[in-house]
Every structure is written in C-alpha cells, then in structure tokens.
C-alpha cells in the first residue's frame, strides 16, 4: 500500500533511524511491527494495552475491540503528523531546521503532546462556563435546550459539554470557573428549599458523582476525558471573578469566603476518591 510523504522527510527519517537504532524506532512508534496492521493486531492480543500503544498518555486501559481500533492507526497518524510539521518547517525555515527539529523530536529532546493528532486537531482549551450556566446546551443543534435550574442539571450539562468539546480536541478541557457556578446553583437550591436536609452532604454528594462520571471511559473509544478544574486563592478569585454577576443579581465578590470554602470541599472530595 503506497504511502506518499515528502521525499526530504523520508530521507531524513531514514538517516535518523539508522543513527539511533530499533529501540528508538519502537519508542517513536515507527517500527514495522507498529506500522503493519497485522503485526499490531497480533501484538495487541498478546500484550497489555499500555505495552502496545505508542501514546503513553492515552488514558486507555481496557483491552477490547474498541480500544484496538482506536490504537491501531496511531503510528500512521503520527508519521503523517511528523511529515506535515517537517514540511511546514522546511517551507518556512529551511531544510536544515526541519531536520534538526525531526531529530530532536525523535531522540526525546522535544516532546509533542498527542503527536498522532497534532496536525489535525487543536490541543487544549479553557472554557468559560457562563453561557452554559445561563443558556444550557446551546451548542447542540436541533435541541430544545433550557438553562439549568438546579445544581444537578448544571453538572449534567457540564458533563455533556466536556464530552462534546473533548471529542473535538486532543488534549485537556479546562473548566476555570466551574466551581464558581456550582457554588451559585448549590446556594440557589439551598436558599429556595430544593434541598432541605444537610447542605454539606448535598454538595459533597454532587461533587462525588461529578468526579466519578468524568472519570468514566466515555471519550474517544476507551478514554476518560482530560479535565482541569481550577482552584484560586482569595486574590485571584477577587481579581478574576469578583465582578461576575449571577442570574439572581448578586455578585461573586459578595461570596469570596464561601467560594474559598466551596473549593476546599471539592478538593476534600477529590482527595477522598483518589
């Protein structure tokens, strides 16, 4: 099966392969046993997923047909990604620079996150959840979405949002103000009598379910989503979110102490689970 790549890239990669040997070739995912689908499938059946995948940060652990199909093409995708980056560097900065980059990437001097998809999809984004909190699942077409009214529905919407956005990027999904909005909906539920029993129990249970659901392998065949939740000290909370107005007309600046405690509860729940 012919695979067409830049000739200078092919020559440079061949020279590097000869210089560093088979061990480096395997580490990079460019060994014939990894590029050949038949050999890969045979190896996948006989080994652990972590020993077969070329992406050690893939967050995939289970051996099944879905994970096999997800991992099978990564060597080819990485090869084409390197070819594309090499071509663009050569075009902009010359062949010598492109060769230097390729060798430094190959020998571990550089590390390209999620290399198999590096030239196809963006890596990480941080998302402001204000619109999600006020409008609901606005990003889904042909969907009669409504703004979340309670903490449970807001967290459900966040899960859907993370799934949607994570499948359109290769890295982490940052949620810098998710705890700001969980605080608002938790306080709203408690003030309006939606939850009348132990308020501390309510938020801890909600956080626990949220964390467990985010860690389910619902992303890209057999991965859990990479999610970053930000924790801020008093000065950052005041500077970044103090002026945020909640839908009820109150401002985040009025609840800084409560927000600090809210963040602490979240971290306690994470610690208990981990």
Language-model segments: which ranges?
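Catalytic alpha/beta active-site cores
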Residues: 1-274
